[in-house]
């Protein structure tokens, strides 16, 4: 009878404690009957009480029905009905019993998985009896660890500060704390000893697996939201579990649950604060700035101070951003200029529309020994510390662009640098026209159209003001050999009413060549032109009549009379002309008739001037030489210009800043003579 009871594990608890580890109750689970029999035999030799089963589900059922019948569980890892790791998790959560895993797989990954899932040991098959004789240590270790956790919780509760909870404000003291005289209080010692005795009793109750456990509280999203609302209402510093519990008003929620969650919530807030402080410290150490607080509006770039970086700008490659006419319908560059300072601006085909009344000043200043940076503007040797920029967007009948710079005479020599060695324009336009201008304190140009002109005009540092559009940009066309070539020069009595493509170049000084590129597209009756006016005369310029007016005038005259233009130049003293200028300006214009009766006229103007600051414009005479490979149009109506292209470029075609200007629009009507061969240019200060 006694042996049967011992075999079934119904031995009294007092007797088991006296003979421990003899009589320790072990549950063995393995699907292999041979291994299970060997394991049972070895456990019996160690004087353990063994219960065996070959299914994990049956073992779990036995544990749930009789929690106090077993002290240890030995389970195989690989079983058909249930994985050994799954059984390990369920036993650890429900019974809190030590579980030893047994398997033939001794890989580190598998062993680590078993330990992380809560296994107290991992044995390899075939198991040895020496290993089974010491498995009782896990049972003792688990009991003492449970008791230590209970004592630790009680110690923390006993030594809790009085101001941590409202329940401890009155009458609760720290165990063993000295009184006012510095001696430990006897009453407090007695109180703590009584609490320890109660803790031992509670520990014995905890050791009993049959004792019911407290229900676990799952903090759902809604429950946590109520908790956070209560904490925010009370304040994180004044929030105590009792007050939070009253505000939450949730059933089956105890003060201990709220206290534990409050502690975790405070740790979470501290961690967030530490991360934020670390980020701020890193930003401060690296010298960073808030990317949003210091941003200015796109429209308001007033007071923009130039960077003073000493690093030179890198040159653009031939296939770079400014290499294609599509991406760069207009460019401004220099050639053969000293490489001491470099200026470079970005010109694209994006649409930028601004009011003509919006004038933004860019304060640009660079030391003489430093080089300009990308997007920085003009170099310091231009003598300009301010630059006003206005973007003109006229949708009706006029697109006028005026370049006015009062700092061109302050020393434009040797300040621009070519940033590329490859041409921006196609190979056909590799031979660019070049002209030399005298530094003028004021230069103004205008481009008038009867219809909406769409184009892209790029200038250094945003000096040229026009509408930049990506809707329709015209690729630059070159000079073909079969085109109608017209060669001529200007004088002060000639006026040119030709519409089409014109190219001209102007340098900052006589030793350097300046290139300006411009590409503009107009409608079938649109016309565009640019001219420069000196300050010594009336600052008016030709207003090309667009649309039906110009075409109607062309219809009434022959083409022969068209090629006899007349430009009226401002009167200039002959002494200045003789002393300062000996120049010959030639215009090369080309007609290229296409299937849509469109015409492209190329104009080439070459001028020479001295490097002095004279504002005198040389007299120029215009003569035309028509090649015989194409017949002259009989009717002037064939000369209607559907598109206007104007390029100002050079062989190197670098994209640098040239003019530091203020935009101003002036227009004036033009009176044509009876023979349509004369027009009035009131004054021309420089040639572009």
UniProtKB/Swiss-Prot annotation:
Acidic residues bias spans: 193-208
Pfam families: Myb_DNA-binding (PF00249), Response_reg (PF00072)
Location in or out of the cell: Nucleus
A molecular function (GO) term: DNA binding
Ranges where the Response regulatory domain occurs: 25-140
Keyword Transcription found: yes
CDD domains attached to this UniProt entry: REC_typeB_ARR-like (cd17584)
Domain of life, per lineage: Eukaryota
Stretches for region Disordered: 161-212
Gene Ontology biological process: cytokinin-activated signaling pathway; phosphorelay signal transduction system
4-aspartylphosphate: residues carrying this PTM: 76
Coiled-coil intervals, chain numbering: none
Family note: Belongs to the ARR family. Type-B subfamily.
Protein purpose: Transcriptional activator that binds specific DNA sequence. Functions as a response regulator involved in His-to-Asp phosphorelay signal transduction system. Phosphorylation of the Asp residue in the receiver domain activates the ability of the protein to promote the transcription of target genes. May directly activate some type-A response regulators in response to cytokinins.
Name of this protein: Two-component response regulator ORR23
Phylogenetic lineage: Eukaryota, Viridiplantae, Streptophyta, Embryophyta, Tracheophyta
